[in-house]
Amino acid sequence: EAIIISVTVGKTNGANKSSYLNIVLQDATGTIDAKLWSATDEQIRLFERGQVVRGKGDIINYKGMRQMKIVKLEPIEINDEQKALFLPQPPVEKAVMQKELDKYMKKIHNIRLYAIVHGLIEKHYTAFVNYPAATKNHHDFASGLLYHTLCMLKLADQLIEVYSYLDADLLYAGVILHDIGKVKEFTGPIVPAYSIEGSLVGHISIGHAMVKEMAEELHIEGEEVYLLEHMILSHHGKQEFGSPVLPQIPEAEALTLIDNVDARMNMFEKALHDTEPGSYSARIFGLENRNVYKSRN
């Protein structure tokens, strides 16, 4: 049993030009590419992203990679909570992470910043604690957005300790809300796609609008709001990476750095997990198409 995370239709080159399905199947242990040859119109209609299936097939080696030649495949109807069990899970239980998030929110002593953060997290809590942080590359698993945020908050702790001039309230608030726009950018927690709003606007602009709207709803105005908006808008660090402005305050620079560190280290972790000791991983797109080496130690 597995969940379909990707499916495309192809045509064979022969005279009959029959249809086939390229399917990527996933369970909690990983993914495998699969082929369903001579797919019927009903199968093409039936098998889609997010569908849980039960089947069997033969595992073959294709260009050095494992591939499954599907012999039989049938859909299973289950709810989203059960579907989530087929996805990679975070290394920390969700309930533990939820308590950690609450602890960090309470570290924000600036009442205006706290009100905005609390208001947005409360309003979008279910999505925030269940959505992945991305559809691929980094933290692309159940509750990945929450886990990514907490890892960043722990990195923020260390920067605040070393660089005592940083505004801890602003940095904590920026970390917690930096990806809040992803609760609207993605379609849901299970095998998410980009929403229309997500594709057209993007999570940075969405998140900025959410902060601005919450501040207006709470009748909060002034420099703190501008600074928090700046944190959201600049957190990708460069305009070519999607930020309309560059970091102009140290807290925004710190946010950019720790976001990048955590995302990239997660990509290294994923690559090592799927690689045998003493060998190299496949090329990692998010790491400039590098191959990652896994030592024998």
Segments predicted by a language model, with ranges:
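Helix-hairpin-helix/helix-loop-helix acidic hairpins
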Residues: 150-153, 160
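OB-fold single-stranded nucleic acid-binding module
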Residues: 7-19, 30-85
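Extended, charge-rich, solvent-exposed interface segments
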Residues: 67-132, 206
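Divalent metal-coordination and catalytic microenvironments
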Residues: 2, 50, 152, 259
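N-terminal intrinsically disordered, cationic/polar leader segments
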Residues: 256, 280-288, 295-297
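Active-site flanking loop/helix segments enriched in acidic
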Residues: 126-147, 191-195
